[in-house]
Amino acid sequence: KLGYGGAETGCYDLAHYLPENNCISYLVTSGGQLLKFIDKKKVKLIKLPVHSKNPVLMLFNSIALIFIILLNNISIVHARSRAPAWSCLLATIITRRKFVTTFHGTYNFKNPFKKFYNSVMVRSDLIIAGSNFIFSHINKNYPKYLDLKKKFLVIFRGINVDYFDPSTTLDNEEDRLKSDWEVNKNKKMILMPGRLTAWKGQETFIEALNLVNKELGYESFNAVILGSDQGRDIYSKKI
């Protein structure tokens, strides 16, 4: 699904970048919050249940992707998560198209089956690691899937520098956010953006705030943890 995570926003950004460089862009997704922002004049949107890990639905998605690839003469298929990657792998093998994957995180594996499931992300013609850490993680944990025929490289995450240009920020927009967050306008603000999940470090952030409090006192600053819990109610309540 096209939520607000790094993999999803990267997919969204690339899908809109390609048409600006004389490429036709197709985006296959099951839905999500970013759908309302997609420029349908640039990006051709196709909805399929690609979020599902159900083997029957994954096979259905593969068949649907085969028709989509052939009917639209698609040359390259790029997957960013595991369930859709399996569907894409089968579809690209049958249609003989190039297959690209971006390996965004350290997928957990506690048994051989889970590791095999994860391995689809390194079965492509081109494997993109989002950082040097992920590059090392792949080399360490999935070496048997890497060979000289594959291209394997690091492409760091980027941002839209026009959208995130501080000089374009409006004062009234800042005031509205501070009002929504119920923070004091005259205090310094410490912001922790990111999805609410344990490995993102929100608990460490709170521990760090306690250290800042000892030095400066809570009355000298505001702290905001910003992000979606994506259904992780227990963790958000703990925070």
Indicate where each model-derived feature is located.
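A short, active-site helix/loop in glycosyltransferases that binds the activated sugar's phosphate group
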Residues: 124-154, 159-165
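Short donor-sugar binding/catalytic loops of nucleotide-sugar-dependent glycosyltransferases
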Residues: 1-3, 193-197, 212, 228-231
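Nucleotide-sugar donor phosphate/pyrophosphate-binding loop at the beta->alpha transition
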Residues: 56-61, 98-100, 105-124, 136-144, ...
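Glycosyltransferase donor-sugar binding loop
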Residues: 27-33, 159, 193, 222-237
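A conserved mid-protein helix/loop that constitutes part of the nucleotide-sugar donor-binding site
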Residues: 8-13, 188, 192, 197-214
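A short helix/loop element that forms part of the nucleotide-sugar donor recognition site in Leloir-type
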Residues: 165-183, 239
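Short His-centered aromatic/hydrophobic patch
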Residues: 79-85, 103
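N-terminal strand-loop element at the rim of the active site
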Residues: 1-5, 10-56, 139, 144-151, ...
